[in-house]
């Protein structure tokens, strides 16, 4: 039996009700939900040292608890010393329990550890209800031991929702506890 996330319980009990009230959905099937979270890390130094890809894969595995895949270049570019098919990044797609557990850890532990954090930008929605933001350092996650890190690397996190508009997706993520930048309202 899988362990249910606290955030998933909050979504089922509280967030669905507030979404129904806010957007006047006729059916519970219209309520936006999280579909997946994709974490992508570009390892630019991997062209010179192949061990960097292994380190990047290991770090993503520690952070997410799921085995990532190596992303490969599509074509050769001589100026970047890049060959076709060479591993240049790492990617992992989280769904179901792994997704909810990662989001809980991201919101409650990792994001508060970001230096000089003032909130996530509200302008990073793609127009289809998906939200993407970047993390500059992997050390904000508790699984990464600072002394073992040779180089600080960042990665992109994309939260894919079933929301039709950015407004619905933003309301969903706000209700789940995502710390967005406070906008200045007219007095």
UniProtKB/Swiss-Prot annotation:
Record InterPro entries: Ribosomal_uL5, Ribosomal_uL5_bac-type, Ribosomal_uL5_C, Ribosomal_uL5_CS, Ribosomal_uL5_dom_sf, Ribosomal_uL5_N
Keywords from the named record: Ribonucleoprotein, Ribosomal protein, RNA-binding, rRNA-binding, tRNA-binding
Keyword Ubl conjugation among UniProt keywords: no
Molecular function terms from GO: rRNA binding; structural constituent of ribosome; tRNA binding
The record's annotation in Pfam families points to: Ribosomal_L5 (PF00281), Ribosomal_L5_C (PF00673)
Q: Which GO terms describe its cellular component?
A: ribonucleoprotein complex; ribosome
The lineage's top-level taxon is: Bacteria
Q: Name one GO biological process term.
A: translation
Q: How does it assemble?
A: Part of the 50S ribosomal subunit; part of the 5S rRNA/L5/L18/L25 subcomplex. Contacts the 5S rRNA and the P site tRNA. Forms a bridge to the 30S subunit in the 70S ribosome.
Known function = This is one of the proteins that bind and probably mediate the attachment of the 5S RNA into the large ribosomal subunit, where it forms part of the central protuberance. In the 70S ribosome it contacts protein S13 of the 30S subunit (bridge B1b), connecting the 2 subunits; this bridge is implicated in subunit movement. Contacts the P site tRNA; the 5S rRNA and some of its associated proteins might help stabilize positioning of ribosome-bound tRNAs.
Q: Which family does it belong to?
A: Belongs to the universal ribosomal protein uL5 family.
The protein in question is named: Large ribosomal subunit protein uL5
The scientific name of the source species is: Malacoplasma penetrans (strain HF-2) (Mycoplasma penetrans)
